[in-house]
């Protein structure tokens, strides 16, 4: 079976998906490989246990770790069972990985001729920019509206084409039986005038048909309405998301309306009946009215929650989802074959590519492939994005992990000859391994960097212009180093993981709010039912009111906290999962966000639980949402230091900041804060990072490098600090 991959489009502007068989991918890789790349590299000595688990053979790069292998540099056994669940979402239970030590050990095992920067066989071709290769059109349905966000919607009319369930067969058979009985009661003279409990047989047949087959008929009706809306382009743009969300509620509401109308019309209330029978009929009628009222409230509740969830997700997650989807597209494109270069012979016009992702169906292990047009994703605006498009993008992030096209890399690197699905990255260790594979797939042989020409073999010029600034130092040097590429892949994985947790927690919070509102609606419906039945008289209502007042003293504080938590989560929303915040002066990472509580993770991985009602009263600093943050480095020099040396020191500091534009902003200031004890100048350097304090480890590393650089400057300029002269009294003993 061939795996479905996203292509970079055709010249006609159509969106296509290509199927690359495993045999063909292997054959292409062998044709593109050079003789040098096919030669084996002898081992210098037998590999160590750690490297042998990582490296398959002399010509094969290390595999990405999985559940069956150990970590890259694992030298100790885990203290806890491997079957226990991780206690944190953001803390991997693996040992730390030192990439420099790893490379040295692998080089020792593979020989001096091995280089981690050596490219894959895909790279042994001339550097040139071609256009997409001819592809085989697949069943990709793409919108043609340039103003509306374009997405791949594979499930258009899926319900119309789905298999008939067993329940539907039973309902259909029952409908046919009741319909036959109705026809018989209207045509056969014996049954035409026969009555049962004072009601004709045909009326009983109609009533039974409405009650037991009404859902079947309304289901057909709703499918027809949804089909008309889906095929009507102007309507589908904005209301499709709400149509699918409200379909079941509207269906139940229409069914209850039919039952109530049939009950009122079929039973002739002018007919004289016994008082008991009349009372029963009134009770049933009023019960149906109360149930219909509850169904209407349920419909309104569903609509309001859908609007709340849609607006909340667009306002808080759209930008992050847009970036995450683009990053996944970049990773998948760079991990595959250089389609632009292969298409050079055909000469088709280049266009933006497509991102394919698989969603896991809850009922079973089937995965549904979907495709998103990246060109239209770039053009989306938060103010114009529709709820349905937002749902598709959220599904792409929440139900599928960060993945690479692993079969191409595995075929060329390992030569196992078996097809594999897109490999999802599930840990930082696997992100490191994936970064190695992708870098080796893109870079030229024996090159330790990637240039713009290398990326143009996989993407069009417009996409390369968007990708290049993502890597540290690439915009200044015009090259992407392996270290910068690896750091970017790890950063993409961590941000994708945090975003997926945020979407899942938001969905959980909406479900909890839905349960709360449902409970309130059930109570309201019961009260309306009691009022219609005239059971809840004034005395009864007065009694319940006094009980509610007494209950308010008991659960009043709980209700207040619940309301404040809802406002905090859905209105204030000062942070998302994965954000680093400061609460009560302590920097913590948001681990989990629920409707009532938030779980934080300290720098030492200690979990802290805060009620949201308490957090609503506290000032919260959010590093992730902050702009590039400033840094202050204080140091002291001797009061006797000449002004010329201080000026020279400022020039050296400015030169250092200009030489590291990927770490520091050029705008800075060196000031004298104060003079202490007439022998010391307390100075401070104020400069801005190119990052926020969200990346705490990176911030500390940059600050350390800056402090050491200032130390070297002080030593070179012979600037030091001396104590004040001290009076020493000596006494001589006889």
UniProtKB/Swiss-Prot annotation:
What InterPro entries does the entry give? LSM_dom_sf (IPR010920), MscS-like_plants/fungi (IPR016688), MscS_beta-dom_sf (IPR023408), MscS_channel_2nd (IPR006685)
What is a single cellular component term in the Gene Ontology annotation? Answer: plasma membrane
Q: Mind listing the GO molecular function terms for this protein?
A: mechanosensitive monoatomic ion channel activity
Where are residues bearing Phosphoserine located in the sequence? 34, 128, 131
Keywords from the UniProt entry: Cell membrane, Ion channel, Ion transport, Membrane, Phosphoprotein, Transmembrane, Transmembrane helix, Transport
Q: In its keyword annotation, does this UniProt entry include Transmembrane helix?
A: yes
What kind of membrane protein is this, topologically? Multi-pass membrane protein
Region called Disordered, residue ranges: 1-75, 115-136
Q: Predominant location of this chain? A: membrane
Query: Gene3D superfamilies this protein is in?
Result: 2.30.30.60
- PANTHER family from the UniProt entry: MECHANOSENSITIVE ION CHANNEL PROTEIN 10, MECHANOSENSITIVE ION CHANNEL PROTEIN 5
| Functional summary from the UniProt entry | Mechanosensitive channel that opens in response to stretch forces in the membrane lipid bilayer.
User: What's the name of the protein?
Assistant: Mechanosensitive ion channel protein 10
Q: Which organism is it from?
A: Arabidopsis thaliana (Mouse-ear cress)
């Amino acid at each position: 079976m061939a795996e479905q991959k996203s292509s970079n489009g055709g010249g006609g502007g159509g969106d296509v998906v290509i199927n690359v068989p495993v045999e063909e991918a292997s054959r292409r890789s062998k044709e593109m490989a050079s003789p040098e790349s096919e030669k084996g590299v002898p081992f210098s000595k037998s590999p160590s246990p750690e490297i042998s688990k990582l490296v398959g053979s002399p010509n094969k790069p290390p595999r990405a770790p999985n559940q069956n292998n150990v970590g890259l540099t694992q030298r100790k056994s885990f203290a806890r069972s491997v079957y226990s669940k991780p206690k944190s979402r953001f803390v991997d239970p693996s040992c730390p990985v030192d990439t420099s030590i790893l490379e040295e050990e692998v080089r020792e095992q593979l020989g001096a001729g091995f280089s981690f920067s050596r490219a894959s066989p895909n790279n042994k071709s001339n550097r040139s920019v071609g256009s997409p290769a001819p592809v085989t059109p697949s069943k990709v349905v793409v919108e043609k509206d340039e103003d509306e966000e374009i997405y791949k919607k594979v499930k258009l009319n899926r319900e119309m084409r789905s298999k008939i369930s067993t329940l539907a067969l039973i309902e259909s058979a029952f409908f046919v039986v009741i319909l036959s009985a109705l026809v018989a009661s209207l045509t056969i003279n014996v049954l035409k005038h026969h009555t049962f409990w004072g009601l004709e047989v045909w009326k009983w047949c109609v009533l039974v048909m409405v009650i037991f087959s009404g859902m079947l008929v309304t289901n057909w009706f709703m499918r027809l309405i949804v089909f008309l809306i889906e095929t009507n382009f102007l309507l589908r743009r904005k209301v499709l998301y709400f149509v699918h969300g409200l379909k079941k509620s509207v269906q139940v509401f229409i069914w209850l309306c039919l039952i109530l109308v049939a009950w009122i019309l079929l039973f002739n209330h002018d007919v004289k009946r016994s008082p008991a029978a009349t009372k029963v009929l009134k009770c049933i009628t009023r019960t149906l009215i109360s149930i219909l009222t509850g169904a209407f409230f349920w419909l309104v509740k569903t609509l309001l929650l859908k609007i709340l969830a849609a607006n909340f997700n667009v306002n808080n997650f759209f930008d992050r989802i847009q970036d995450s989807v683009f990053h996944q597209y970049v990773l998948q494109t760079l991990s595959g074959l250089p389609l632009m270069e292969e298409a050079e012979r055909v000469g088709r016009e280049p266009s933006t590519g497509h991102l394919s992702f698989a969603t896991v169906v809850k009922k079973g292990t089937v995965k549904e492939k979907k495709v998103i047009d990246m060109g239209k994703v770039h053009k989306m605006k938060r103010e114009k994005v529709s709820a349905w498009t937002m749902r598709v993008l959220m599904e792409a992030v929440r139900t599928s992990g960060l993945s690479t096209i692993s079969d191409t890399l595995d075929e060329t690197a390992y030569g196992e000859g078996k097809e594999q699905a897109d490999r999802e990255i599930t840990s930082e260790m696997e992100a490191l391994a994936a970064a190695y594979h992708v870098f080796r797939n893109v870079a030229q042989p024996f090159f330790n960097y990637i240039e713009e020409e290398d990326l143009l073999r996989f993407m069009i010029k417009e996409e390369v212009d968007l990708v290049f600034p993502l890597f540290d130092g690439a915009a200044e040097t015009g090259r992407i180093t392996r270290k910068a590429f690896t750091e970017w892949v790890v950063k993409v994985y961590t941000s994708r993981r945090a975003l997926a947790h945020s979407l899942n927690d938001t969905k959980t919070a909406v479900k909890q709010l839905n349960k709360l509102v449902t409970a309130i609606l059930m109570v309201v419906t019961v009260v309306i039912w009691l009022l219609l039945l005239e059971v809840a008289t004034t005395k009864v209502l007065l009694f319940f009111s006094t009980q509610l007042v007494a209950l308010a003293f008991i659960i009043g504080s709980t209700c207040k906290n619940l309301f404040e938590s809802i406002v905090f989560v859905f209105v204030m929303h000062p942070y998302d999962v994965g954000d680093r915040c400061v609460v009560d002066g302590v920097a913590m990472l948001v681990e989990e966000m629920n409707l009532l509580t938030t779980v934080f993770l300290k720098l030492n991985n200690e979990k802290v639980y805060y009620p949201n009602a308490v957090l609503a009263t506290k000032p919260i600093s959010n590093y992730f949402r902050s702009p590039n943050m400033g840094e202050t480095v204080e140091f002291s020099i001797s009061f006797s230091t000449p002004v010329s040396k201080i000026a020279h020191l400022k020039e050296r500091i400015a030169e250092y900041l200009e030489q590291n534009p990927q770490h520091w902003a050029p705008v800075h200031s060196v000031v004298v804060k104060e003079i202490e004890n007439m022998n010391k100048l307390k100075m401070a350097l104020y400069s801005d990072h190119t990052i926020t304090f969200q990346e705490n480890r990176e911030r500390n590393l940059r600050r350390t490098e800056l402090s050491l650089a200032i130390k070297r400057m002080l030593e070179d300029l012979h600037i030091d600090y001396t104590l004040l002269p001290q009076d020493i009294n000596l006494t001589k003993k006889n």
